[in-house]
Amino acid sequence: MPGLKLVEALEYRCDRLERLIGAGYSANSDVSVQLDELYNQLHRLYFQGLKYSQDLLQLFNTFMAEDIENVGAPDDICIFASCFDDIYTLYSAFDELNSQYMEFCQISKSSLDQISFKDANIETKQLKKLPELVDNCNIMILRSIAILNRFIDWNIEVNGFFQFQKKRLLNLQKVIYST
């Protein structure tokens, strides 16, 4: 069932994005206005993903600083390190995506106002990059969420282990003090 819920959540998100992107569309509006709106939405999406990744890195750093002594098991440290490396890779990819986005915006904004109608076909090659940028941003956000889920599952497992050990120690303590 969790897979079905994930699919339903992704379908809901896709429908929501389609409504958001399509909400500003009007057959009478200028293409450059529509592109500006798409640029702004992509930029907001990028910064939301970037903030999400930064918060996740802070969580990882805090966890590493506070709980590394309690973890102890080499497998747990490897899992944590792999999550941290993945998040750092995504964080770097977000920076690369932003630089590509800014370059695309500069090229498109400077050229859209100055192109003649007969040259418009040449400039549309730049516009074809926009869906790829949106897809890359969505993929990175989904990967961040998947890594966060791995981290949370692992953290729950480790916490469960330590709670079990604490319960055993308390039971032993009761037995010792009762005798």
Curated annotation (Swiss-Prot):
GO BP: actin filament-based movement; establishment of mitotic spindle orientation
Protein name per UniProt: Protein LDB18
Domain of life, source organism: Eukaryota
Cellular component GO terms, alphabetical: actin cytoskeleton; dynactin complex
Function: May be involved in protein-linked oligosaccharide phosphorylation since the deletion reduces the negative charge of the cell surface.
Species for this entry: Saccharomyces cerevisiae (strain ATCC 204508 / S288c) (Baker's yeast)
